[in-house]
Regions:
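Acidic/His- and Gly-rich active-site-bordering loop/insert found
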Residues: 2-116
Length: 116
């Protein structure tokens, strides 16, 4: 792994109390409902649903996730759905750094398909 660990955050970058308040409000007002709706959709990974493409559940959760990301109205957000034959689609989005001199990258990875 090339990422530096335990690096100090520059002062003034983020007010922890403001961030916590925002995250708590979002969690209570939006995210819990989004997660509740998501877990009701049986979007199983191909290893557990050979008819995943025909069933369309992964397509549904992908569309819902893309709509949620776009609804956040993040400045500079670029969203793309990457499709390869025979593979589950990938939701890829990129947000440029807020400071031009920033050379750091943050990678977040998750799955929209599930396992029973």
């Amino acid at each position: 792994m090339n990422a530096p660990l335990h690096r100090e955050m520059p002062g003034g970058t983020l007010d922890a109390a403001t961030a916590l308040d925002h995250a708590t409000r979002q969690w209570d007002s939006d995210i819990v409902k989004q997660l509740t709706d998501y877990i009701q959709i049986p979007a199983k990974s191909p290893g557990f649903d050979k008819d995943w493409a025909t069933n369309g559940y992964i397509e549904t959760v992908l569309r819902n996730a893309a709509q949620w990301v776009e609804a956040q109205k993040v400045e500079g957000l670029k969203l793309e759905i990457v499709r390869l034959p025979g593979r589950t689609p990938v939701l890829f989005f990129d947000i440029p750094a807020t400071k031009a001199e920033s050379a750091q990258t943050v990678l977040m990875y998750g799955h929209l398909d599930k396992q029973p």
